[in-house]
Amino acid sequence: GVMVGERMEATEVGTPQGGNISPLLANIMLNELDWELEKRKLRFVRYADDCIILVRSQKAAERVMKSITRYIETTLLLKVNRKKSMIGRPTDIKYLGFTFYNQFKAKKYKAKAHEKSVEKVVRKLKQLTSRRWGVSNSVKAQKIAEVLRGWINYFKIGSILTVTRKLDTMLRYRFRMCIWKHWKTPQNKFRNLVKLGIGQKNAAKAACTHGYARICRTETVCYAMSNARLARFGLLSAEEYFVKVSS
């Protein structure tokens, strides 16, 4: 089958979408395209059938796109998907989950995670920190770490430091809500807050406060469940992990 938008459609011929054989066959078929681009002294990047060709002007881009499309279709006998083909500046491109931004001081473009890639990992992390998910918080921390490590190791060649900081802020807030729900009763919340160094007056006030979102933004809860304590519990810091693997 093949995914068309969000709908699965049956297919009788072809290779499975997302299978290991698809990029292998693409590399075999498009090896001659690489030679042709090198012969024309064009700068390009290709992964399987996804290719970017770099030129200096709009006019050159239009000329190259027309001639390379003709080469692919008449010489290689392959069909170019014109809906997915475009001419644009690096900042307009989404390539393998990345986009690019202009670093004016360095006078060059640099890679970063595309906003859709960030939105996708945020949705996944929100699922893993859902208060309705009936697993222990230690399991949640383990699953969060798996997702963060995979995502950061893939995007670490780009500028994602700001993104990792935002992910940490979101995850710590949502994880505090998970812990708060796990404590259940006001009595249990009071006892745990006192154990974590909160004075009895503030602990009693917090324990009787309604609303997860409200209480888990307070100074009392943020102090009791500090970043360091969450880390000791097993919640991975996206920023710290990114700095570690990118240095």
Give the role of each language-model region.
Residues G1-S247:
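Non-catalytic terminal/accessory segments
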